[in-house]
């Protein structure tokens, strides 16, 4: 027997538990006798023998442990999705609209002399950074809101560094100022704190002290004229409510397949997560835009903080811990634009996945030590809101569907029950699809796309949990806008071949190759049709890997 194999057997005997050793040593000896002839034939035989033993005593136990963990996460996620769906069904059946649950009356303006004084002062904040393609739309929509001109201040928080963007914003503000709109263009000489820093700086101006509420819109959001008339009454008549959040409506959902997939995911977020949180717990995550805050509540919660990339969620959790309640109004929609380039969408998802994980790390003890909210709400915040929806869902989706399931074809000893591979995923997918009935025929594409994106979300989640690398990276989501969209897409088409290198995403290609290999192995040696899923999923990773998702704008 070669010294190499003797050393391996020594390690095996040394590391094996004593109770396990007596039973297994004879098995090893017998295995050695039967394979000793092969072992003596050369180093290849030794490597094969070592691989078999390592496979049995190292890889299989680890994989079985991972399968068990994934099964537990699958069950937790399934229960959470069913719970939210049941809540939404009861809300719809009982017709528990926000106007019925909370007091809501239109503002009385019958008395001409007192009409304007019945309207509270409202600050409208529009933070932006180098967004010349869409800034005119948001500023114009905010200035067209149906609200007395002397009871409204439009505040444009422009952190732009691009001279063309600055000039365009200033020109737009001047145009509306000449029409009698009380509009302020506030420019900082730095970008400290990014969006949170801009919003915080905007609240420090003296003229803000006269305002009771603040409405926030990102640069690509276009509220309807009656937005304030439909949301402010909730805050006027219900003093315990601090936030009114409205739904997003996507103006470019039909632009490409990727935007359709985003529409499906975000519709579910609003229909299920926001609706259930508002109805049962009077809490949900502020979406950062298309919402109205009570300024007193915002200040009591500590104002805007830039410790994470989800300053909106941070503020919402802190306000909740002070006892404030939120209301989600599903019927009030605010038009906005989805990111249509894969690069922009990846940056957005990194921020949306990394930030909540990092915030959970920072606020868990603060939530537990809080004395103003009930233990039930603390449990909801830590477990449902953060752990399941912001941590488990990302890690489980990637690890289970993109790593564990493909690996099971290489290790027949791994048994995954059908409820985890068929019943639970099917139920969750159907529940998600109900939020966007017009896209039911795209379910297969949505599943494959979400699995691809889960890789980036999982990576971002671990970065947030560990506070590593890009944990505080803030990249403004690129929006093409309607005015320049056709021009930019045409430019991308003409440079398709010369800019191909910009499209390549090596992580997607690596994962796609692994899943494709597992599919080929299952096709050759498996006894089922599981390879069909593996080939489809690998194709989805390949398509993302070569950048053929969404529109493409080459770097100049």
Curated annotation (Swiss-Prot):
Family that this chain belongs to: Belongs to the glycosyltransferase 2 family. Plant cellulose synthase-like A subfamily.
Segments passing through the bilayer: 56-76, 391-411, 428-448, 509-529, 530-550
Bilayer topology term: Multi-pass membrane protein
Catalytic reaction(s) noted: GDP-mannose + (glucomannan)n = GDP + (glucomannan)n+1
Gene Ontology CC terms, in alphabetical order: Golgi membrane
Keywords assigned by UniProt, alphabetized: Cell wall biogenesis/degradation, Glycosyltransferase, Golgi apparatus, Membrane, Transferase, Transmembrane, Transmembrane helix
Gene Ontology BP terms: cell wall organization
Function according to Swiss-Prot or TrEMBL: Probable mannan synthase which consists of a 4-beta-mannosyltransferase activity on mannan using GDP-mannose. The beta-1,4-mannan product is the backbone for galactomannan synthesis by galactomannan galactosyltransferase. Galactomannan is a noncellulosic polysaccharides of plant cell wall.
Active site: 159, 312
Gene3D superfamilies: Spore Coat Polysaccharide Biosynthesis Protein SpsA, Chain A
Protein name (database record): Probable glucomannan 4-beta-mannosyltransferase 3
Subcellular location: Golgi apparatus membrane
């Amino acid at each position: 027997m070669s010294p190499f194999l003797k050393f391996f057997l020594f390690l095996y005997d040394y590391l094996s538990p004593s109770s396990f050793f007596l039973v297994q040593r004879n098995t090893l000896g017998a295995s050695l006798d039967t394979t000793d002839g092969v072992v003596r034939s050369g180093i290849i035989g030794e490597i094969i023998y070592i691989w078999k033993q390592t496979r049995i005593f190292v890889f299989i136990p680890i994989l079985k442990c991972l399968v068990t963990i994934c099964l537990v996460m699958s069950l937790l996620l399934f229960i959470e999705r069913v719970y939210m769906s049941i809540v939404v069904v009861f809300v719809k059946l009982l017709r528990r609209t926000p106007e019925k649950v909370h007091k809501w009356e239109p503002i009385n303006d019958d008395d001409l002399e007192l009409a304007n004084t019945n309207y509270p002062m409202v600050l409208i904040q529009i933070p932006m950074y180098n967004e010349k393609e869409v800034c005119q739309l948001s500023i114009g929509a905010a200035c067209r809101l149906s609200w007395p001109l002397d009871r409204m201040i439009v505040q444009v928080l422009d952190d732009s560094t691009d001279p063309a963007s600055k000039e365009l914003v200033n020109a737009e503000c001047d145009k509306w100022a000449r029409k009698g709109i009380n509009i302020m263009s506030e420019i900082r000489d730095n970008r400290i704190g990014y969006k949170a820093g801009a919003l915080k700086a905007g609240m420090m101006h003296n003229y803000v002290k006269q305002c009771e509420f603040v409405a926030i819109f990102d640069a690509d959001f276009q509220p309807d004229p009656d937005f304030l008339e439909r949301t402010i009454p909730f805050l006027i008549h219900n003093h315990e409510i601090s936030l009114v959040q409205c739904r997003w409506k996507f103006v470019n959902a039909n632009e490409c397949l990727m935007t359709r997939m985003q529409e499906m995911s975000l519709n579910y977020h609003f229909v299920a997560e926001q609706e259930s949180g508002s109805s049962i717990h009077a809490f949900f995550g502020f979406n950062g835009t298309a919402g109205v805050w009570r300024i007193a509540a915002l200040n009591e919660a500590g104002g805007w903080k830039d410790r994470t990339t989800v300053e909106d969620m941070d503020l919402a959790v802190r306000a909740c811990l002070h006892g404030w309640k939120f209301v989600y109004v599903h019927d009030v929609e605010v038009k906005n634009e989805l990111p249509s380039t894969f690069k922009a969408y990846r940056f957005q998802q990194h921020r949306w996945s990394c930030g909540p994980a990092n915030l959970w790390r920072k606020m868990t003890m603060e939530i537990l030590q809080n004395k103003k909210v009930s233990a039930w709400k603390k449990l909801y915040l830590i477990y449902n809101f953060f752990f399941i929806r912001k941590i488990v869902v990302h890690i489980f989706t990637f690890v289970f569907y993109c790593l564990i399931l493909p690996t099971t074809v290489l290790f027949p000893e791994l048994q995954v029950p059908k409820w985890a591979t068929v019943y639970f995923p099917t139920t969750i997918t159907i529940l998600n699809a109900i939020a966007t009935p017009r896209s039911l025929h795209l379910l297969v594409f949505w599943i494959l796309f979400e699995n691809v994106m889960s890789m980036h979300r999982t990576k971002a989640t671990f970065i947030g949990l560990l506070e590593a690398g890009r944990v505080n990276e803030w990249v403004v989501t690129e929006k093409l806008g309607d005015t320049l969209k056709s021009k930019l897409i045409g430019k991308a088409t003409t440079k398709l071949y010369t800019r191909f290198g910009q499209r390549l995403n090596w992580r997607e290609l690596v994962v796609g190759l692994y899943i494709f290999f597992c599919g080929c192995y299952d096709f050759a040696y498996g006894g089922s049709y599981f390879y069909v899923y593996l080939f489809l999923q690998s194709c989805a990773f390949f398509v993302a890997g070569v950048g053929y998702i969404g529109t493409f704008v080459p770097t100049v």
